[in-house]
A protein has these predicted regions:
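Gly/Ser/Thr-rich phosphate-binding loop
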Residues: 91-94, 119-123, 133-200, 204
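Short, well-ordered beta-strand segments
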Residues: 30, 46, 70-72, 78, ...
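Conserved pre-ATP/AMP-binding loop-to-beta segment of ANL
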Residues: 17-34, 65-71, 77
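Conserved AMP-binding/adenylation subdomain of ANL enzymes
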Residues: 43-72, 80-120
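AMP-dependent adenylate-forming
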Residues: 1-22, 52, 172-175, 190-384
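Conserved G/P- and acidic residue-centered "switch" motifs that form tight phosphate/ATP-binding loops
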Residues: 38, 93, 153, 231, ...
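ATP-dependent adenylate-forming carboxylate-activation enzymes
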Residues: 1, 94-117, 123-131, 155-156, ...
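Conserved adenylation A10 loop of the ANL superfamily
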Residues: 32-45
């Protein structure tokens, strides 16, 4: 093991022997993260040194370098959410505790690790923390030093925020938004109790970072359109895939300076100076002539206090959407599923039109999660 002085000596020797022409340059490729898409074939997103540097300058500005920071991450390093814990911890000289898959699959082991972690900054998908809330021991007593929960990668629901406020005292809840193609995230907002109550239906993802501009392409009469990101964290494109790069990426302008742009495929709108995201445009389905946002159904199902988690998927027949199926985790023992299903549908009918009521409700003990900690929609579709 090297001590600090030995490491400094090695670094100074190495630095002196390398010509400046070999230093990493702003536009040099720094890392590639593969992301799946509608085609099912992963695409390698090319992030430059400049992309990451600009992200870090902005993101780490929310923290005090003098504080003893311990980032806690759960996603594998192949998932872009890990960028929010790995690189900031190095940049700030902070610590990083990584919960590996083996521990995630065993609550006893995972909770032991969480308790020992001394984590101050929690970073995860909303689905991952919902999984943790299955155990009543998941609270401030387990992690007394945690002061901030940061979420990205999925829609954050008000019910999840309320659980955190209830179980973790004064800890901040931060909602963010951004695709892999723009170096993880480009927005930030603290969801206070007041904000959570005000925007219960759809929480804001926050104000847009400096060096970035967001506009909405082809907005409808309500001002909702596809989110387009222009700025200094937008990637070079997809690795060895010029066709899709040219389709999704382009050039924009910020303060007279040319910057990369990216078409996200996400539906959004602005309100009160903040960006709101309504999910993937391709998560919308058309059923009997009605266009339906599936996450809207989930959001309304969660207004039922007996439902802890919900995820709705379409059921297809001959390539067309024939009905909707909602998977739910129920908070109580179920004796008569037919009666409970009927009650859930009756409650939902008070909130949404008839055409948005799922034909079938499936009860699960827990939601299947993919390797990135998100609800595995493909697995749910297989269960339909």
């Amino acid at each position: 093991m090297l001590d600090v002085e030995s490491a400094k000596e090695i670094l100074s020797t190495a630095q002196g022997s390398i010509s400046k022409e070999h230093y990493v340059k702003d536009k040099d490729l720094f890392y590639i993260i593969f992301t799946s898409g509608s085609t099912g074939k992963p695409k390698g997103v090319c992030i430059t040194y400049n992309n990451l540097n600009n992200f870090l300058h902005w993101y780490t500005g929310y923290y005090d370098e003098k504080e003893e920071l311990v980032f806690l991450g759960h996603p594998p390093f192949s998932f872009d959410l890990s960028v929010m814990s790995l690189w900031p911890s190095i940049y700030l000289g902070a610590s990083l505790v990584q919960i590996d898959k083996k521990h995630q699959e065993n609550f006893k082991l995972m909770f032991e690790e969480l308790n020992k972690s001394n984590a101050t900054i929690w970073i995860s998908t909303p689905s991952f923390i919902e999984m943790c809330f299955i155990d009543k021991n998941f609270n401030q007593s387990l992690m007394p030093k945690v002061k901030q929960f940061v979420f990205c990668g999925e829609k954050l629901f008000s019910t999840t925020v309320a659980k955190i406020h209830e179980n973790f005292g004064d800890a901040q809840v931060i909602n963010t938004y951004g695709p892999t193609e723009s170096t993880v995230m480009v927005t930030w907002v603290e969801i206070t109790k007041e904000l959570n109550a005000k925007y219960y239906e759809n929480l804001p993802v926050g104000e847009v970072k400096w060096g970035t501009k967001v506009h909405l392409a082809d907005p409808d009469e309500e001002g909702k359109g596809e989110i387009v990101i222009t700025g200094n964290t937008v990637a070079k494109g997809y690795f060895k895939n010029d066709a899709i790069t040219n389709e999704k990426f382009g050039l924009g302008e910020i303060d007279g300076k040319e910057e990369r742009s990216y078409l996200t495929g996400d539906l959004g709108y602005f309100k009160d100076g903040m960006l709101f995201c309504e999910g993937r445009i391709d998560f919308q389905v058309k059923l009997h002539g009605h266009r339906i946002e599936l996450e809207d159904i989930d959001n309304n199902l969660l207004k039922n206090k007996k439902i802890r988690q919900a995820a709705t998927v379409p059921s297809y027949e001959e390539g067309k959407v024939k009905s909707l199926v909602s998977f739910v985790i129920y908070n109580q023992e179920i004796e008569k599923r037919f009666e409970v299903t009927k009650q859930i549908k009756q409650e939902l009918k008070k909130l949404v039109p008839e055409y948005m009521i799922p034909k079938k409700i499936v009860f699960l003990d827990e939601m299947p999660l993919n390797n990135n900690g998100k609800i595995d929609k493909k697995k749910l579709k297989e269960l339909v």
